[in-house]
Amino acid sequence: MQQIHPAGQATLLADTRNTLGEGATWCDRTRALYWVDIEGAQLWRCRADGSDLTPWPMPERLACFALTDDPDVLLVGLATHLAFFDLRSGAFTRIVEVEPELPTRLNDGRCDGSGAFVFGMKDEGAEPPRAVGGFYRLNADLTLERLALPPAAIANSIGFSPDGSKMYFCDSLVREIFVCDYRPGGEVANVRPFARLTDPDGDPDGSIVDRDGGLWNAQWGGRRVVRYGPDGVETDRVAVPTAQPSCTALDGEGRLYVTSARVGLSDDALADDPHAGGVFVAQTRHAGMATARFAGTPRG
């Protein structure tokens, strides 16, 4: 039996109390953590110690984003479309609308090693959500293509192996993370199970892949982050002192950052979980990779 390394408990870094914190992303150039509050329609940033906490309001819900080569420009995935956002001026440059014919919104996304942005959708037309949303790739030339992956109700856990040959993803309503072969042009093949959640509580949410090829998955409702090795076997576990951890990021020194959410919690639950929606941090034994950046520019 493979040993599970208890990586300790995460502690509160920023008491932001986001409604739906997501999209944790570490920038090695600015030495800062970025994330979103989807339902609060905000982008957030802070330093590794939680200082210099800065929010930016968005014109609609912000679900995901990517760094670019310009530290002051992000690719942002708003609920209905993709755009460039200038942190200095607050200006948006619209790129493309996504799934206008469906009651879906953008959800999770990460860049691949070639600088394309890969993301998935969330159904908002039914409760529980239906598996109708696609997975997409925005190329550096700003063309959009749908990946040949099964549709999802709540697309999540998107990430890539260190060599770029594998893509990870999940539907949060299915308690399993999948992996597929991934080629530079965005071709996907050989979809197969990667890791199944075995605890009685918790659903797979956002993930990050470390330098050693391990995938750190935030497990919504499970109060934990679990690391799965490249073989899909659990190796590490971090307890998170809030009910709904939502997404993960790693810096180059092995610090694990975890966003969380308040949405859906009752007043009694929030009284017992006052820092829900905050950002948490834990030290791990695995360093993060440099975050892949979107290779496109507002000029295409």
Swiss-Prot record:
GO molecular function ontology, one term from the record: L-arabinonolactonase activity
Keyword Hydrolase: yes
EC number(s) recorded for this UniProt protein: 3.1.1.15
InterPro entries: 6-blade_b-propeller_TolB-like (IPR011042), SGL (IPR013658), SMP-30 (IPR005511)
Top-level taxon: Bacteria
Reaction(s) catalysed by this chain's protein: L-arabinono-1,4-lactone + H2O = L-arabinonate + H(+)
Co-factor(s): a divalent metal cation
Record carries keyword Glycoprotein: no
UniProt cofactor note: Binds 1 divalent metal cation per subunit.
Residues that hold a divalent metal cation according to the record: 22, 156, 205
Gene Ontology terms: biological process: L-arabinose catabolic process to 2-oxoglutarate; L-ascorbic acid biosynthetic process
Pfam families: SGL
Annotated keywords: Arabinose catabolism, Carbohydrate metabolism, Hydrolase, Metal-binding
Known role: Catalyzes the cleavage of L-arabino-gamma-lactone to L-arabonate. Is involved in a degradation pathway of L-arabinose that allows A.brasilense to grow on L-arabinose as a sole carbon source. Can also use D-galactono-1,4-lactone as substrate in vitro; however, the enzyme is probably not involved in the metabolism of D-galactose in vivo.
The family this protein is said to belong to: Belongs to the SMP-30/CGR1 family.
Stated name of the protein: L-arabinolactonase
Organism of derivation: Azospirillum brasilense
Gene (name only): araB
